[in-house]
Amino acid sequence: MKHLITLTILLLSSLLMCSCSRSELEPCDDYRQAMRDFVVRISETARAQNPDFIVIPQNGIELVTLGEDAEAALATDYLSAIDGHGQEDLFYGYRRNDTPTPANTTDYLLSYLRRSKEAGNTILVTDYCSRPDYVANAHTQCDAEGFVSFAAPERELNVIPASVPPHENAQDIARLSDAQNFLYLLNPENFDSRADFIHAVASTNYDVIIMDLFFNDGTSFTADEIEHLKQKENGGKRLVICYMSIGEAEDYRYYWQASWKQHKPVWLARENHSWPGNYKVRYWYSAWQELICGPGDSYLNRILQAGFDGVYLDIIDAFEYFEKQ
């Protein structure tokens, strides 16, 4: 009988603990607005230090309007906080590399992207294709829309294309709206050293470089290295933008604590099985936002200290994950 009572108490305790953990979750009434507010906070924090700092969210283009479709009222506060939009797979790569994106998906994305462009934003499109005819068509389609095109040969974004950038030029690029092309080189795994990476990127004439803050060994690029990359090989000046994920936590980043895998902070959600080591986050939690853009040793402050011209925000579309829960 004592064993039965003990077992019952343990079961009740377990249920109470589960109930408490659920009740401890901060409610979010509007996942889309919460993401907009987060991006606005990042923008305001950065521009307090550098008024010219560039902010570019990637994907999650639905946030540009306040309703359920592209014709709804514009989210003006959000649009005022950003300088452009990054969009993956617009024409190629939605299902897999070197595959045309379904026409209905392209049309859906275009309906929002056009509104963002009309509001004054620069649209950076990354299509995942390497076939020469697909690459040429991706550039042509973007030109027709007034978008800036990059055809990524690999999904891992670890390759500098062998071809010259579209609309290669020697102009000084002072604003994102000046850009006619860009390089998205997020993963430096194919480079044996920092010096090799710096040399390879510096030897290009792209108007904008989007890269990570860190090299393969986990050390961040220095302000001197970033300053060196701000000059094209032909002598023109360019912008160097830093990638930062704000909708997922990554277990290889400096902020990650080993204990989180056994004792998750309340804002840490499920692992993304498509990208092992990446975890969805409840991005409306102040504790997560402090890691990203709070005072002190936040991710954003590290980016600012390294001298980047702006930030390229990923997993903006995390709101979709929570809307489906």
Positions of predicted regions on the chain:
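C-terminal motif of bacterial Sec signal peptides marking the signal peptidase cleavage site
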Residues: C18-S19
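Glycan-processing catalytic domains of CAZymes
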Residues: S23-Q325
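Positively charged n-region of N-terminal signal peptides that target proteins for export
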Residues: M1-L4
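Bacterial N-terminal signal peptides
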Residues: T8-L15
